[in-house]
Design a protein with these regions (language model features):
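Catalytic domains of carbohydrate-active enzymes, especially glycoside hydrolases
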Residues: 22-41, 95-96
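Glycine-rich, proline-tolerant flexible connector loops at the mouths of alpha/beta enzymes
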Residues: 33-60, 109
Length: 146
């Protein structure tokens, strides 16, 4: 069995589509099968943070997702995301992503939309990569997904 290699770009693209595209291109050249970004709303997770302007700039909007997904498709590398709110999952679904990722912070069930996001992902019956890096309730997550 061949390993499926994911280039974890997350939010490390400085809010610049050109930087994100360069990272996607380099990931493809390095042999990655997929690139993975994070799709969250700054207002949900970082309200009042001292670095608000920097954080807000790194937010992956629907328009940016579409641009990066189209670019990834053109290069022949899979694009997917950790979606942090239900509408992000719906939008990713409309673009035809093949899989989703549950972020570890979503698995802790402490984010504002954790349960709704997990339920939405489950409804699409696609492969899900689950991160338990921050803990979380493995049994509860399995139950929701099944």
């Amino acid at each position: 069995m061949r390993a499926f290699i994911v280039a974890e770009i997350a939010s490390n693209w400085e809010g610049s589509v050109s930087v994100a595209k360069k990272l996607i291109k380099e990931s493809k050249k390095a042999g990655a099968d997929a690139v993975k970004f994070q799709m969250w709303r700054a207002s949900d997770l970082y309200q009042g943070h001292p670095d608000w302007k920097i954080i807000k700039k790194s937010e992956l909007t629907f328009a940016k997702v579409k641009t990066l997904k189209t670019y990834s498709d053109k290069l022949g590398i899979e694009f997917f995301c950790s979606g942090f709110y239900p509408e992000s999952i719906e939008y990713l679904q409309s673009l035809g992503v093949k899989r989703y990722k549950l972020a570890s912070r979503t698995c802790t069930l402490n984010d504002p939309h954790s349960l709704e996001t997990i339920t939405k992902i489950s409804s699409y019956k696609k492969p899900v990569v689950i991160s338990m890096g921050m803990g979380g309730n493995k049994n509860k997550i399995k139950k929701i997904l099944n």
